[in-house]
From Swiss-Prot:
The modification Phosphoserine is found at residue 468. Its EC number is 2.7.11.-. ATP binds at residues 345-353, 367. It is found in: Membrane. This is Cysteine-rich receptor-like protein kinase 18. Keywords: ATP-binding, Glycoprotein, Kinase, Membrane, Nucleotide-binding, Phosphoprotein, Receptor, Repeat, Serine/threonine-protein kinase, Signal, Transferase, Transmembrane, Transmembrane helix. It comes from Arabidopsis thaliana (Mouse-ear cress). The chain crosses the membrane at residues 288-308. InterPro entries: GNK2, GNK2_sf, Kinase-like_dom_sf, Prot_kinase_dom, Protein_kinase_ATP_BS, Ser-Thr/Tyr_kinase_cat_dom, Ser/Thr_kinase_AS. It is a single-pass membrane protein.
Length: 659
């Protein structure tokens, strides 16, 4: 009985060691040769920020993204990539888990990469210098399968060499087709007589040339042949290329590998990696018990330390991130020529916006809050905390802030084409927005809100979505701006209430105005209004005549729907580059967004699917909120369920008491 107990304990211990090794050993490399950083320094905070948003950016860019955040010397460059054909959810999960693994493993290295995955292959890399287009051969990550080949090595080598050579040739000769994520990718199988199939996968990053890809993959093959020949598979990975083969089918980067109990040393030259030797010495029951006790206690201490550290991290993240993004007031004054009038870009509800240029040549937009503005220090800090945690191609990027004396300044990336309303509601500029451009703007706004609601590590409710808060870059790509009113939701939180309603009339949902209740569906309502404005070129806050009655835009569109004349909504300035079916579908989606009951409105993920997949059947919309039922004795400012006086003012409302 004692022997059986010892055997059970031994089995548990061996299982634990193998399981623990499988988790900790991976094809990741923290590079010590390019410098280190101090934990919680500006560089570290920028690193955490860009990695936290990498998954959403990768999925938004069809499987491949490269970008940077911050200002030198704290600027962090990062890239993320998934294997072609990866499902969005699978890709997003792979990027998120891989990013988190890098943060936990590379504690102070300024350069690191990790090829990872179970259901799909993905890459995450960050560095303190630009690397796009540059072939980097060091360091090398190496893992080999501990199982040994049991076949004729000569015959096996011939098939193995033929397979790897043909794959490399195929990858580098057909690199021009497909999108970035499908460039330089191949998986293949070869049959070894009287043995098993060889499954192999290769991929390069799409930013390098085909010649560099060829060089990188060939060196991976050579390194494996020199270090690990005779084993049943393994992984060789570099920052720009990945190679894996096994004697069984696989999909991800490290799943199902029978990993050694400790990782082999990295290969920097074609020298063999030391094999893991097995010891057959007997271990006494007392020693086994002692080992198990020590192991369990160690695990408990590690978990406890992780929980405490995570709680401290969460508390720190809610504080103002002063170290990473704070600018000296004199720096901002110098960049804007002391807030010169000629540098003024415009004036918003909370102050003025100025163009500036930092000493390193970076163009910036400085939001200078007026001393009498409704946005106080609480809202100011809220905008800094919220935006500093976000990174997406369709969100304006916060570079920093300054809070000195009475001056409250927010420093954003400069977006050259001003805001959407500057074009949309101008009688001469709106003709620059053809249907293709308006459709792309709607799609970009959709992805930005979807990121806020679902894909970022925070759940953000914007609460002030409107045309003037959508900025347009040089390529007319939309960027959501102005997060002063935004609220962070908990993971499981869906609805919140407030006694202080903020936002802009015409864009605010009925339940928010009348009851102070807001949720993701409040943003959906605002987005629906935006869709209708973008298609019509009309402001929701304006009033229109139809059948001799006064209407707001939402009511006007609803009556067009009832009359089956939605085509009348289309802005006459839109060029003839559209189909009426597509335009009507977009109007239909807009009406679904502005339905009175929040439960009837679709989520942003459903909206994205509706916009991108025309085969999805749209439900019939119900009457919208603030639908004016005009008639004898009726008040034109009355909705179908609540009496409410609408304002046509475009300024953001900061203090309204809900009923």
């Amino acid at each position: 009985m004692a022997t059986k107990s010892c055997e059970l304990v031994l089995c548990f211990f061996v299982f634990f060691v193998i399981s623990f090794s499988a988790i900790s050993v991976s094809a990741q490399t923290c590079d010590n040769t390019t410098g280190t950083f101090i934990p919680n320094s500006p560089y570290d905070k920028n690193r955490r920020l860009i990695l936290s948003t990498l998954a959403s950016n990768v999925t938004a860019q069809e499987g491949y993204f490269i970008g940077s955040i911050g200002i030198a010397p704290d600027q962090v460059f990062a890239t993320g990539m998934c294997a072609p054909g990866s499902e969005r959810d699978v890709c997003s999960l792979c990027i998120r888990s891989t990013s988190e693994s890098l943060l936990q493993s590379c504690l102070d290295q300024a350069d690191a990469f990790f090829w990872s995955g179970e259901e799909t292959l993905c890459l995450v890399r960050y560095a303190n210098r630009p690397f796009s287009g540059l072939l980097v051969m060091d360091p090398l990550g190496a893992i080999f399968n501990t199982g040994e080949l049991n076949t004729n090595q000569t015959v096996f080598d011939i098939e193995w060499n033929n397979l790897t050579s043909s794959m490399i040739a195929g990858i580098t000769s057909s690199s021009s087709g497909g999108n970035n994520s499908s460039k330089y990718y191949s998986d293949d199988i070869a049959l070894v007589p009287d043995f098993k199939n060889i499954s192999a996968l290769m991929q390069c990053t799409p930013d390098v040339s085909s010649e560099d890809c060829n060089t990188c993959l060939r060196q991976n093959v050579v390194d494996y042949d020199n270090c690990c020949r005779g084993h049943q598979g393994g992984v060789m990975s570099r920052p720009n290329c990945f190679f894996r083969w096994e004697v069984y089918p696989f999909s991800g980067a490290i799943d199902q590998i029978n990993l050694p109990k400790s990782p082999p040393p990295s290969v920097t030259s074609p020298s063999p990696i030391a094999n893991i030797t097995k010891n057959d010495s007997r271990i006494s029951g007392g020693k086994i018990a002692a080992i198990v006790v020590v192991t369990v206690v160690t695990i408990i201490l590690v978990v406890l330390g992780f929980v405490i550290s995570n709680r401290r991290k969460q508390k720190q993240e809610m504080d103002l991130p002063t170290e990473s993004v704070q600018f000296d007031l004199k720096t901002i004054e110098s960049a804007t020529s002391n807030f010169s009038e000629r540098n003024k870009l415009g004036k918003g509800g909370f102050g003025e916006v100025y163009k500036g240029m930092l000493m390193n040549g970076t163009e910036i937009a400085v939001k200078r809050l007026s001393k009498t503005s409704g946005q106080g220090e609480v809202e100011f800090k809220n905008e800094v905390v919220v935006v500093a945690k976000l990174q997406h191609i369709n969100l304006v990027r916060l570079l920093g802030f300054s809070l000195q004396g009475e001056e409250k300044l927010l420093v954003y990336e400069f977006v050259s084409n001003k805001s959407l309303d500057y074009f949309l509601f101008d009688p001469t500029k709106r003709n620059q927005l053809d249907w293709t451009m308006r459709r792309n703007i709607i799609g970009g706004i959709t992805r930005g809100i979807l990121y806020l609601h679902q894909d970022s590590r925070l759940k953000i409710i914007h609460r002030d979505l409107k045309a003037s808060n959508i900025l347009l870059d040089a390529d007319m790509n939309p960027k959501i701006a102005d997060f002063g009113m935004a609220r962070i939701f908990g993971v499981d939180q869906t609805v919140a209430n407030t006694g202080r309603v903020v936002g802009t009339f015409g864009y605010m949902s009925p339940e928010y105005v009348t009851h102070g209740q807001f949720s993701m569906k409040s943003d959906v309502y605002s987005f629906g209004v935006l869709i209708l404005e973008i298609i019509s070129g009309k402001k929701n806050s304006s009033f229109y005549q139809m059948d001799g009655l006064v209407n707001n835009l939402v009511t006007y569109v609803w009556k067009l729907w009832e009359n089956k004349s939605l085509h009348e909504l289309l802005d006459p300035f839109i060029n003839q580059d559209f189909t009426s079916e597509e335009v009507i579908r977009y109007i239909h989606i807009g009406l679904l967004c502005v339905q009175e009951n929040p439960a009837d409105r679709p989520t942003m993920s459903t909206i994205h699917q509706m916009l991108t997949n025309s085969s999805i059947t749209l439900p019939v919309p119900l009457p919208p909120g603030f639908f004016f039922r005009n008639g004898p004795g009726s008040n034109p400012g009355q909705s179908n369920s609540k009496s409410f006086a609408c304002s046509v003012d475009e300024a953001t409302i900061t203090d309204v008491n809900p009923r």
